Amino acid sequence: MARLLPLVATHPEPPINAPLHTPNAAEAHAVVRDGRPLRVALLGYRSAPFSGGQGVYLRYLSQALMQLGHDVTVISGPPYPHLVEGVKLVQLPSLDLYSRDLWSVTREELGDSLGRKEWFSKLSGGFAEPETFGERVRDWLLDHADEFDVVHDNQTLAEGILDLQRAGLPVVTTIHHPITRDLRVALAGEPRWWWRLMIRRWHRFLGMQSRVAAQLRHIVTVSRCSAADIATDFGVRPGPLHVVRNGVGTA
């Protein structure tokens, strides 16, 4: 785990209104271990390049890590991110039911247990992608565990991610904010009881995310406010939480 920590919390958190910190050459060198760059796996259960934010985040984070000299691989479910040259992409296909008709799924696709889970979840108004991606990426990484020094999960928060930690892989997770906050906003704006039921159904993955987050050893978030929300809503103790502010490009 010694290799992981410099990427998570190299500096104490600055005051709220402090300028963002830019690593200098010495600090960039400090995250290199054993005379070689780190081999970083960045995980995203869906990484659309132009909407939702996850694909944008993975593009810029992977680019910055590569510019620091690290060997970066993004492992993603569909839709896949647009990455800069030099960053590798491992595609883990799913049914991707938000880009196709539910009834276009073939019998062969439903022969897979994870495919069935995605299909029946979508049929009943749920969202199973974080859970199913967690299982797929767990199986893939356990087969390639010796190829990476750090596994950085982008808010999948699935049981499969916890399995990787239990297996001894160095795992860090970014939680931008707990989606429990989105759920509250959605419920507050919907007076119709049947739609409120559907909103709660879609957000059922939050039970899994809360259980997983409370057991993770290393969590990155982007602000003190998000850290407080994560502690309150997900029951995360202060120890695993590290605030690392989002970078801002000034060029």
Regions of interest found by a model, annotated:
Residues 39, 71, 170, 217-218, ...:
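Residues at the starts of beta-strands that form the adenosine-phosphate
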Residues 102-125, 165-207:
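Acceptor-binding helix/loop patch of EC 2.4 sugar-transfer enzymes
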Residues 54-65:
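Short amphipathic alpha-helix
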